[in-house]
Regions:
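Short secondary-structure boundary segments
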Residues: 38, 106-108
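Short, hydrophobic alpha-helical packing/hinge segments within bilobed ligand-binding/sensory domains
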Residues: 23, 91-92
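Amphipathic coiled-coil/heptad-repeat helices and related helical stalk/stem segments
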Residues: 19-20, 59, 87-88
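PIN-domain endoribonuclease scaffold, especially VapC-family toxins
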Residues: 26-78
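Short, flexible helix/strand-to-coil boundary loops that buttress conserved ligand/catalytic motifs
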Residues: 14-15, 27, 48, 115, ...
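Short, well-structured N-terminal submotif of metal-dependent ribonuclease cores
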Residues: 1-36
Length: 133
């Protein structure tokens, strides 16, 4: 099963644990295949470093762990006008490039209301875990 986890899922998994960490555990156990893009890596670097005040070495360590779990894809389309937040376009681009079955996100304002996008099911972490039970 091909999955793109929104950057908010990685942040929540790393900082808070819970259901988002359970999604990363599924990738560690090879139950799901995770994908991310360089734009998503940049957003993760920025949020962990600037928003959470992590040191560069701690950010590098977290990104290394994520990179071990997720395959890097290079989106070949540039989306706009679908959602209000441009960073969310980068997430959708990654999902398309990965040919993802699911996009897992906590974004209730922009992404979850879409429900599906070009064949990609967009679900919350809890809904995704429930689907796998």
């Amino acid at each position: 099963m091909r999955v793109v986890a929104d950057t908010n899922i990685y942040i929540s998994a790393i900082v808070f644990g819970g259901s988002c960490e359970a999604i990363l555990a599924l990738a560690r156990a090879h139950v799901i295949e995770l994908y991310l893009s360089s734009a998503m890596q940049g957003e993760l670097r920025s949020v962990l470093g600037q928003t959470f005040g992590w040191s560069p070495s701690r950010v590098k360590e977290a990104l290394a762990e994520i990179t071990r779990l997720a395959s890097l894809v290079r989106p070949n389309v540039r989306l706009s006008g679908i959602v209000a937040n441009d960073a969310d376009h980068r997430i959708l681009e990654c999902a398309l490039a990965a040919r993802a079955d699911f996009l897992v996100t906590g974004d209730k304002r922009h992404l979850l209301p879409l429900k599906t996008f070009r064949g990609v099911q967009i679900v919350s972490p809890r809904a995704f875990l429930d689907l796998l039970r």
